[in-house]
């Protein structure tokens, strides 16, 4: 049985006991024993470990983990300190500077966001090395859709930040009118100029949180 170490254990108890997760677990046992996969098995649930269910103020949905060595550590868009900052995250930092005047960090670790209540959740939590989307059909999508549905049930407001078509497809699960959805193009260099730049997701998140009487996020990462 997986142990997250906070209220997610109770919230997701049925999911972790269910047939879908058992299928995921068997798939991962085989994948991790025969191939290089990311993140480390110990980091798969870091998004949930760092951000308790009842502490979630905002959700930034990613697609699947970075698939090169040393990058993925269980938080969407984030890399460990000392690892080169990927292009999508460089663009996130550019928008953060444009939006709130926060200079780009010298590292790509977003742990500070996670510890303040920003759930950095990928819709697929693992990947085989060098093969983007290689685990997309193993059951993770259903598992993380269930997480979004659980968050939708919360009676305190959450900001859902959906970048790109994959993330925006999850909007169907956000039906509770107390929540706030921010949508735009993905920060990837392929699409950032199609509506990500200039979308001001960070200030808009904080404006909404303050209007709901919730402490805003300090978006600095260092």
Region roles according to the model:
Residues 2, 14-162, 166-169, 174, ...:
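A polyanion-binding, active-site-adjacent surface
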Residues 194-196:
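A non-catalytic structural micro-motif
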Residues 5-8:
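Short, contiguous pre-domain boundary segments
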């Amino acid at each position: 049985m997986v142990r997250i170490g906070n209220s997610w254990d109770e919230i997701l108890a049925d999911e972790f006991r269910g047939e879908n997760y058992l299928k995921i677990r068997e798939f991962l046992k085989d994948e991790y024993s025969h191939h290089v996969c990311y993140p480390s098995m110990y980091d798969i649930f870091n998004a949930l470990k760092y951000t308790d269910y009842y502490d979630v103020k905002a959700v930034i949905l990613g697609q699947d983990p970075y698939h090169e060595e040393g990058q993925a550590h269980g938080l969407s868009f984030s890399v460990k300190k000392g690892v080169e900052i990927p292009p999508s995250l460089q663009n996130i930092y550019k928008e953060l500077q444009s939006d709130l005047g926060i200079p780009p960090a010298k590292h790509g670790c977003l742990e500070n966001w996670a510890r303040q209540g920003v759930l950095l959740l990928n819709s697929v939590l693992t990947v085989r090395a060098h093969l983007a989307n290689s685990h997309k059909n193993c059951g993770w999508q259903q598992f993380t859709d269930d997480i979004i549905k659980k968050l939708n049930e919360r009676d305190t407001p959450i900001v859902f930040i959906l970048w790109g078509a994959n993330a925006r497809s999850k909007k169907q699960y956000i039906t509770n009118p107390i929540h706030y959805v921010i949508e735009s193009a993905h920060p990837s260099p392929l699409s950032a100029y199609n509506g990500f730049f200039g979308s001001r997701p960070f200030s808009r998140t904080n404006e909404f949180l303050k209007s709901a009487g919730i402490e805003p996020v300090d978006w600095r990462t260092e």
